[in-house]
């Protein structure tokens, strides 16, 4: 099932070349449904907005939370049953699925927790 919609649990993530703690990832989930996104931490929505699929990837348009008013261009791909997203937190579309110090990139590999309802 290669639909981006559903509830996704991060299995691995890194920001600016540093791996995110597993304990943080275990409490986080990303929901993509009907053009809207929600990021939950411990079941509480901490960030939300809209998304649109583009010819080059996916763009998040934040409406509430730390990304309110921001446009975040991102790459995405499916690798087997995993969804990989590389977010351009600086507003620039990443050119590859990697991060390094000072780049303002967030890379996450997700597994599907639940399909879209």
State where each predicted segment sits.
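Short, solvent-exposed loop/turn segments at conserved positions within beta-propeller repeat blades
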Residues: 100-103
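Contiguous, well-ordered beta-strand patches that form the walls/edges
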Residues: 11-25, 33-98
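Short beta-strand-to-coil "C-cap" segments at the C-terminal boundary of structured domains/repeats
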Residues: 109-117
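N-terminal helix-cap/turn-to-beta initiation motif at the start of protein domains
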Residues: 1-9
């Amino acid at each position: 099932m290669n639909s981006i919609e559903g509830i996704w649990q991060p299995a691995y993530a890194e920001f600016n070349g540093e791996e995110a703690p597993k304990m943080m990832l275990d409490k986080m989930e990303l929901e993509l449904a009907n053009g809207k996104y929600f990021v939950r931490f411990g079941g509480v929505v901490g960030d939300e907005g809209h998304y649109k699929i583009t010819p080059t990837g996916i763009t998040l348009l934040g409406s509430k939370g730390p990304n309110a008013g921001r446009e975040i261009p991102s790459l995405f791909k499916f690798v087997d049953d995993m969804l990989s997203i590389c977010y351009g937190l600086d507003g620039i579309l990443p050119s590859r699925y990697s991060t390094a110090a000072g780049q303002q990139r967030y890379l996450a590999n997700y597994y599907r927790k639940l399909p879209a309802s």
